[in-house]
Amino acid sequence: MLYTVSHSPYHCDLSALLRLATSEDDILLLQDGVIAALKESEILKLLLNNPASLFVLEDDVIARGLVGQISDNATLISYTHFVDLTLRHQQQLAW
């Protein structure tokens, strides 16, 4: 399953997502969801303790002026890689 998080982590229930995600899943932070990948944030720690892989859309990081503030533990990806993730996962859930 591909979980896409496009809302600020302060305006959505990420704890519910984390209860569902498994090691076979990917989580993609995009739009305002990229805030969840800020270095040293408590939300980031929760995401990194989850077995799912964590990706962050680089264009949205740049658009929000957050370059250099995103954790190195989150993988920055391009729109091309985003498309690859959608092809890899038959099921997707927007969060």
UniProtKB/Swiss-Prot annotation:
Pfam families per record: DsrH (PF04077)
Alphabetized InterPro entries for the sequence: DsrEFH-like (IPR027396), Sulphur_relay_TusB (IPR023526), Sulphur_relay_TusB/DsrH (IPR007215)
Predominant subcellular localization, coarse grouping: cytoplasm
GO annotation, cellular component aspect: sulfurtransferase complex
GO biological process assignments: tRNA wobble position uridine thiolation
Keyword vocabulary terms for this entry: Cytoplasm, tRNA processing
Cytoplasm recorded as keyword: yes
UniProt KW Thylakoid keyword: no
Domain of life: Bacteria
Record's signal peptide: none
Subcellular location: Cytoplasm
Residue ranges crossing the lipid bilayer per the database entry: none
Listed HAMAP family: Thiourid_synth_B
Subunit (UniProt): Heterohexamer, formed by a dimer of trimers. The hexameric TusBCD complex contains 2 copies each of TusB, TusC and TusD. The TusBCD complex interacts with TusE.
Annotated family: Belongs to the DsrH/TusB family.
Function: Part of a sulfur-relay system required for 2-thiolation of 5-methylaminomethyl-2-thiouridine (mnm(5)s(2)U) at tRNA wobble positions.
Protein name: Protein TusB
Organism: Yersinia pseudotuberculosis serotype O:3 (strain YPIII)
